Structure formats: C-alpha cells, structure tokens
C-alpha cells in the first residue's frame, strides 16, 4: 500500500487564491500566520527606512548616502577611553567640584553652582567607574564604597543648594573634599 505525500509547502509573498495549499484548515492557518509575519516585517522596515529617505543630506554623493543608509543619525562612537584619560578627567572634574565652593557659598549663586556640580559629577561618574573596572577584583569593593559615598554626598549637596541651605552645602562640600582626598592616593 503506497502512502501518498501531501503537496510540498511553498511560500509566496502574496496570497494566491488558486493555490492547492489553502484547501485544508491547517494550511490556511499557516498561510495567515506567515502573511501576518510578512506584514509585520514590512511595517517595521518601512517605519525605519522611509523616514531615512527624508533626512538624507542631498549634498552628499549617492555612495555616501548608501553607506550611511543604516546609520539612522546616530553619532559616531567615541574612541575607547583609557584608564589614564579617565584618571586625568577625574582629577579635572574634582578640581571643578572643589571650585564650586566659591560659586555656591561665597557668591551665593546656587543655581549656577548646582549646574556646574551636576555637569562635573556626571563626567566624574563615568571616569571613576572606568577606573574601578580597571582595578583588580580584590580592590573594587573599597572603590565602590568610596564611589557610593562620594556621589551620595554630591546629590545631597545639590539638594541643599537648591534649598539655599548654606550650612548643609558647606557640610557636604567638606565631606566631598575629604572623600576625593582619600581617593586620589589610592588611584
């Protein structure tokens, strides 16, 4: 007794009404699922590629446009930061934070001092984290605790500056300077 094979499955981009595949219910469900997948893929691609056509710089050559087609306007990646650059950046930002005392406490420019504090702290955070990752695993817990206490103090100082509380700002400033003085000999 010979077993008859079902017709081979074939997938087309468009749904063919005359196809012998769609005669059974299971094949019909398969056809609907694949057409939904195709639709979703096409919508996804068109949603990302069509806006690119409107944002091309027409002054560039067509080969440059083709090379940048999948760039999606992302900035070029930064070159890899080294530990030496991170240490230099950490020292520079620490000096900026130490100068904030003049802005906040002596001149009472709370808003400007807070902006400078947040900018320097943001840059310092990235550099300090890179330095911690470069340290041997046995030294990292100490640096992580210094990292945590430093940036908690910076955050508290920022909130005290927003409230205009000079005594709290001075207290947190002294704490920050002490932590920074503890960090630099260990690096």
UniProtKB/Swiss-Prot annotation:
Subcellular locations according to the entry: Plastid, Chloroplast thylakoid membrane
Gene3D superfamilies named among the record's database cross-references: Oxygen-evolving enhancer protein 3 (PsbQ), four-helix up-down bundle
GO cellular component, one term: photosystem II oxygen evolving complex
Transit peptide: 1-32, 33-60
Coiled coil residues, start to end: none
Organism superkingdom: Eukaryota
A Pfam family per the record: PsbQ
Region forming the signal peptide: none
Keyword Transit peptide: yes
Membrane topology category: Peripheral membrane protein
Keyword hit for S-adenosyl-L-methionine: no
Annotated knockout phenotype: Impaired chloroplastic NAD(P)H dehydrogenase (NDH) activity, probably due to a reduced stability of the NDH complex.
Stated role: Required for both formation and activity of the chloroplast NAD(P)H dehydrogenase (NDH) complex.
Assembly description: Subunit of the lumenal protuberance of the NDH complex.
Family: Belongs to the PsbQ family.
UniProt protein name: PsbQ-like protein 3, chloroplastic
Lineage, uppermost ranks: Eukaryota, Viridiplantae, Streptophyta, Embryophyta, Tracheophyta
Gene that encodes it: PQL3
